[in-house]
Amino acid sequence: MESLVKTQYVWRALMELDWHPQIITGTSVGGLNGAMFVLDLYETARDMWLTIRSRDVMELPEENADLSALHQFLRRVVKEGGMDVTPLEEIVERVLDEDALRAAPIRFGIVTVEQRGLRPRELTLEDIPAGQVRDYLMASAACFPALRARQIDGVKFLDGGYSDNMPTGLAKTMGAEELVCVDLEGVGITRPNLTGLPTTMIRSYWELGDILHFDPDTAKRNMELGYYDTRRAMGYLRGCAYAVSCDAQSCEDAAAFAQKFSQLQRAVREKYPVTLTADVALKLANMTKDDQLAPLEAAAEDAGVDPTRFYTTRTLAQAFLAACDKDRMESFAPLFTGSSTAGQAALAALLPNTFLQALVWRTLTAPALPEVTEDEGL
């Protein structure tokens, strides 16, 4: 459930961009967020997710419980079919007004699954009997077996993630003509989008935390990531892992960095072919959305640069230079001056991520390499 809070700042970004949905569908606790979106409870949702902890939404053992107490707790959880989420239910009861939800201009739908036979149930608000919206929202979020199945009118229901974490088909059935999807890559099934509708997909490069973990610090981080992921998906930022400005100066700096990095990489590779492992490190970083910034972003990630801030190409480079191990970067200098030993080249091959950092560091700190034309190379 931790990754749920990311959608709060997706919400904030969409509001800033003056994007107003006519239909919202959601699964699991994403359905809870969707309901609050329909009710325009942004501040309520934000404050809630920034303050609650795991034990505020589910029954957990005491923090200092001994091994015997933990075993007893686990036996009871297994016997009762999952943890008790009465605290979460009380929160839902407090913040969600069913009458207001039904009167809202935004149509709303959720997914849950009948435990018997794992039969999916895609439900619009109109399909849900009066007085049972909170029950079905809790059913959609019943992450069995960790949490108890939700019983409604004698039928037990499970988390909608057993059917579809991202119900695009339901949205189309309800009349959607364009989709903005938030893929949290959560536990469960995420079916491919076969609607054929124009779609903007919002995903995070970063790990968002445990699904059943609530923590204010992690929540704040995920909210910031969600905000920037949304602006990037909408074309207002560039980069893959980091939020980088796409203004003219930042783009000019990115192009200059990419050219200089390519020159340096080519020069080192030709003299020390064993350092090709740095190419592998770059591919494994999976920075596929922005080739010009990919080496800088990969190096920044390895150096531990904060991804929850807004950067220009220049300030991201400065953040990397401040975070990297300068002595370690300097140790690769002979590879760049052509005076390296076989042992130093082998070390670069064995430490591809660190050497990729060194390549970026050298690109940012060394004078520009002269251009070599084909005629000059003969």
Task: Tell me the role of every PLM-derived stretch.
Residues 1-27, 35-378:
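Patatin-like phospholipase
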